[in-house]
């Protein structure tokens, strides 16, 4: 539920559209 290198992920992690680097963990 968080971005790699960040504390929070925006949008849907599965779509990889909520993370600046495009990588989401959990």
Swiss-Prot record:
Instruction: Give a GO molecular function annotation for the protein.
Output: toxin activity
* Highest taxon in the source lineage: Eukaryota
* Key words of the record: Disulfide bond, Ion channel impairing toxin, Potassium channel impairing toxin, Secreted, Toxin
**Keyword Nuclease appears in the UniProt entry:** no
Taken from the UniProt record, the cysteine pairs bridged by disulfide bonds within this chain are 3-24
| Record-linked InterPro entries | Scorpion_toxin-like_sf (IPR036574), Scorpion_toxinS_K_inh (IPR001947)
- Which GO CC annotations does the UniProt entry carry? extracellular region
Transmembrane stretches in the record are none
Q: In which tissues is it expressed?
A: Expressed by the venom gland.
Question: Which locations, inside or outside the cell, does it occupy?
Answer: Secreted
Additional observations: This protein elutes at 21.22 minutes.
Family assignment? Belongs to the short scorpion toxin superfamily. Potassium channel inhibitor family. Alpha-KTx 06 subfamily.
Q: What is known of its domains?
A: Has the structural arrangement of an alpha-helix connected to antiparallel beta-sheets by disulfide bonds (CS-alpha/beta).
Functional summary from the UniProt entry: Blocks voltage-gated potassium channels.
Q: What is this protein called?
A: Potassium channel toxin alpha-KTx6 OcyKTx1
| Organism encoding this protein | Opisthacanthus cayaporum (South American scorpion)
Which lineage is the organism of this entry classified under, starting from the top rank?
Eukaryota, Metazoa, Ecdysozoa, Arthropoda, Chelicerata
